Amino acid sequence: VTPIAAQSLIHGDQSQYQMACKLGDYFRDNQRVLFSFNGINYDLKVLRHFYFENLQYPYQLSQDDRIHVDLLHASYAARDFSDEIQFIINEKGKKSLKQTDIALANGIDVGVAHTAADDTKTLMQIADLFLEKIPEIIFTAIECGNKFRVQNKMIEEEYFCHSNPWSSKALAPLIRNSIKGMENEIYFFDLAHDPEKYINASETEISK
């Protein structure tokens, strides 16, 4: 991922602070699209804490000039909007969105799962698979690669579709989200509910 050798971090004479500076310099000077799998909920949090405790700017990868694609979120879209990606059905009868399961379902060798090197190789192969099989989802993910891009897309698009991380039906067919700083209010229609059953309903009926 970076040209920094792991052995130099373990056995080298640099401090943790120096390591944080080196990582910060690398990410600052290499403004590429960053891919991760569940990185929003895990990796970026760990990195922010690491930067903070070493006196570095913790939100380096959250600025408006950075693009981050979380392939777990792309997997939600692949599950709901495409038949091109294979999924393992778990014990609950639902499609498994674990990185290892997605890889195995699509013929990708995961090596030794949950080790840094093999997990990174698996991530790269899943990214290649998604780019080949569902390019429209990957390019849309890049278009929505940070919160500023998402807000712009939600304002500019007449219809904005997104996939929920959960697969169960929402309790209400219509949800209003007022996002601070946006010019308009966003209404989300849950398409798990048949729109014909409520599209002409009154506000009182919908609120039930």
Language-model regions, residue ranges each:
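Metal-dependent phosphoesterase core characteristic of DEDDh/y 3'-5' exonuclease domains
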Residues: 1-8, 25-135, 141
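Acidic catalytic cores of enzymes that act on phosphate-bearing nucleotides/polynucleotides
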Residues: 143-207
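Short glycine-rich, polar/acidic loop-and-turn segments at beta strand-coil junctions
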Residues: 13, 38-40, 192
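A short linear-motif detector with a strong N-terminal bias
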Residues: 13-14, 26-27, 47, 165-168
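Glycine-rich, highly charged phosphate/nucleotide-binding loops
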Residues: 10-23
